[in-house]
Amino acid sequence: MIEIKKLCKSFGRIKAINNVSLSFRQGEIITLLGPNGAGKSTLMRLLTGFIYPDSGQITILNNNIEENRIEALSNIGYVPENSPLYPDMTVFEYLCFMSKLRNICDSIFEKRCQEIIKNFSLAEVINQKIETLSKGFRHRVAISAALLSEPKILILDEPTEGLDPNQKHELREFIKSYGQKNLVIVSTHIMEEVEALSTRVVLINKGKIIKDTTAHALKMLSPSGNLDEAFRNIIQNRSLL
């Protein structure tokens, strides 16, 4: 679904993404894991077209992102960690607005909206203004809006940030279900999430891919079988790669 070849992106002298090549397929849930400033968010912004690479190529569902930008990006739903919302709108008004931007017809929007309200427990806030909502509810609204067009590729940056334990569980179950027939890419620092969600774990540090593996294989690199310990060992000791 996504092919990345020799991708590079620098900001001044800092190589945020350095010669990255990856391939992602339908039915995968990819976790991007790395320390702060590793390049995870930059890679996500490149995949979603918010910034352009200095060199290299991104192909999404056989569409080169530079040559067929609209076609490529139409298949992606993206939720950054701090999603820009319209605080004066109600939740329903915002979902309507986003559906119009994506040219979703009214009948399909009505069906999708009902599903989303149920899946993300939004019934109690659907007519409230976004500015009155908690951070957790705002994040759920942002994810809901990204799902209106039923994208084949869903990209989530810190998706459970601000959610309570029950909300985290519900969202993780949804991600696992959605990832069975689509591609989901998640950036997170929560090891419990990495273990619960991932079919693949891609470790990034200093703009480079240092390991492409599974959560189980990653755990085995720790004497105690601890995922967080294994991650720290890899970042601190390249001899474990």
What are these regions (language model features)?
Residues 168-180:
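Helical segment within the ABC ATPase nucleotide-binding domain
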Residues 96, 100, 107-125:
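Conserved ABC ATPase "signature" region
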